[in-house]
Structures are given as C-alpha cells and as structure tokens.
Amino acid sequence: MGVGCSVTITMNVVTSYTIGIIGGGQLARMMHQAAIGLGVRTRLLASDPDESAAQVMSDVVVGSHLDHDAVMNFAAGCDVVTFDHEHVPTVLVEEMEQAGYAVRPGSAAMVHAQDKVVMREFMAREGFPNPAWKVCDTPDDLVSFGNGHGWPAIAKTSRGGYDGKGVFKIDGPDGVGEPFDAAGGLADGKQPIRILAEEFVDFRRELSAVVVRSPSGQGAAYPVTETIQRHGVCAETISPAPDLSSDRQVELQTMALDIAGRLDVVGVLAVELMEREDGSVVVNELATRPHNTAHWTIDGTETSQFENHMRAVLNLPLGSPALTAPVVVMANVLGGSEEDLTGALQHCFARDPELRVELYGKSVRPGRKVGHVTCLGNDIEITRRRAHHAAAYLMGEHDA
C-alpha cells in the first residue's frame, strides 16, 4: 500500500491489487465491471447496502463518505483509492494522502471538480476559456454583477451542486437572494460555500471532452461528444459530435489533455463545454472521475472510460479510445412509469438485437438515472431514433 501503487506482472501472472472505490453509485458499479476483466479486486465504501454498486460487489463496507473514521479505516484496507463522486470533503482526501495512502485522483486535482470557484480561478490563471465570472459575498455583489454583465445571470453554489442542482438562473435583482439561501443550507462548517456569478452564455450546444491520464503522464482522448440536457440532466450523447471538424476535435481534445496535465489528474477527466454560435467554447465544469457523457465508450470504443480509469489508477498503459462505429448514440433511461425494467427489455431486444443496455439496479422514480442504452450505427438520425425508442420504452412510453 502507498503512493507508488502499480500493477506488477510476475511469470505472466498479474499480482492482484485492491482498488477501493468511495461511493456506491452506478459509476462504481461499472468500474467494478471493468476491474473484473483486469483481474483486480475492488472494495467499496457505500452509504447503503442496496446502492447500485453494493448490489454486485462482494467486499462492501457500509459507511458515510463524510465520516472521518469510516473513510480512513476503509483506505487502510486498499492499495489505492478512487472515487464514484466528488463529495468526499477535501480535507478528508488530503488526510488520506498525508497518512500515506495512494489516492487517485489526488486532492490537488480533485478540488477543481469539488469547488467551482477554485476551478474558475485555475482556468483564469492558466488561460483556459472562462465566461465572465465573479465571487459574490453578498446579494448586492450579485446585483452589481448582473447590472454590469446583463440579466439573466447565472449563480452557482461553489460546492454541493450536480445535475443542475445548486445552479440558479437569476432574471433580475429581485431573485438574488435564492442562491445565498441555498448556500446556507449546504454549509457543513468544514468547507466554505461561496456564490459564484457567471455571465449567461447563450450557447448553441453543449460538448464534452473526456480524457484519461496515468501517473506516468500518458494520456488518451475520447472523441468529443455532443450532449443533450433535459432539466439539467444529461439525456443523450452523440459521438463524435456532429458538425465538428477534425481539426476542432483535436483542438478540444488537446485542451482537455492540457488541463489534465496541469492539474496532474490521474484517471478520467471530463471537461464540460458550452459552444457559442461562432464555434468558440467556454469551460462549464470539470469532473475528475468517469462521467455520464462517456458511458457510450463501454460499447462504442475499443477501451471504455471505466477500464481506462482502472488502468490509470493502477499505472497500467492506457487502452485505445478509438471508435468501434462511425456513430454512437447513448440515451439515458430517466425513471418514468415503467417499474418492470427487465420485462421491458423483451420488447427492446426483440425490436433491436444490436441494442446495448446497462441497468443500474436502482428503484424507479421520476427523473432518476436508472440506466442507459447505446446504439452503434452509420447514420446519425437512424441511430438516434433507435436509442430514443429504447430509452422511451424503458421509461414506460410504450407508444414511442
């Protein structure tokens, strides 16, 4: 155990290491699936024994990612620790490192996904594309920002938000109190919650540049993906992003790899982008873990983001991110009226034998990510229709 963790091979047999995953969601579940093929043991810290990953893993510790003793005791039983989410307090990640545990990604990288203000400061300092932004200490500061940059303005809590939570579109001075009220509800006394104001970017679409980086500095870049959001949640991805030239693909991939290198990221880094009408982009958010916008890589590339994340964590050479089809479309299954997901598969598979489905073992409730479907093809619109039908049917829309 320790910071030098890497897989060794003796007489053609991989010496098995234990990767600890903090967080029991579907990302951990799919990391575990990737680790099986590598002959690597996984250990899970989950808040509930019925969480998605806990259902399929044998070595499960039930405990909170906010509990100091639970996290430190868990790390002691692992060769290297990685994450299903960014919600472990930064101070706890730092303490694991100080105790000599191998943590990948490390706290210095991960904080840029945990704290939006820290991320914006880094982007500005390093010259990456930011929207206009300002840290607001008071509602009056937010009024001043909106008056200066125009309404509507976007206000975000610096920590605690995901899938559109913690993000507020403020139409005018009368609405500036809401984000400050939300920040008060998120405060835990351990980490400051600040309000970040950003200009409202009138973007034409959202893109995602997902890369992987190993401790030795090797990088791999997946094709840039167009993402379609509904109610702040990713509903669909199209890969590679349509109407994006090869040169522009390379530029955005290179930028994402550059960010990963400067932050010393180990594992997956997702760079969420907003593309304006003129083709320019600004960085929206970062994620230092496998990402929903790259679930399509399980079936649509030679090496999935999950396997490459596991490889990076173990300092193994990274696998090829090359496409396995000209067009790959993923559609999320967002909980609807269909409770018998297994029964619905009979229709979906009979209709489309090439359909790929991942269900996460989660109970169904409106808007909740309970799975995704992936379709590979040659024509964008035909492939999208296939994915839309399957996802809609699994959500209970049987007339789709």
Predicted stretch roles:
Residues 212-214, 274-276, 360:
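Short beta-strand micro-motifs enriched in acidic
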Residues 112-208, 212-259:
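Active-site nucleotide/adenylate-binding loops and adjacent lid/helix of ATP-dependent enzymes
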Residues 132, 152-154, 193-198, 269-270, ...:
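A short linear hydrophobic-aromatic micro-motif
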Residues 250-271, 277, 287-336:
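Active-site "cap" helix and flanking loop/linker of ATP-utilizing ligase/carboxylase catalytic domains
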Residues 220-223, 269, 281-285:
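Protein kinase-like catalytic core scaffold
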Residues 4-121, 140:
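ATP-binding N-terminal substructure of ATP-dependent carboxylate-amine bond-forming enzymes
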Residues 5-7, 11, 311-400:
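Peripheral (often C-terminal) accessory segments that flank ATP-dependent C-N-forming ligase machineries
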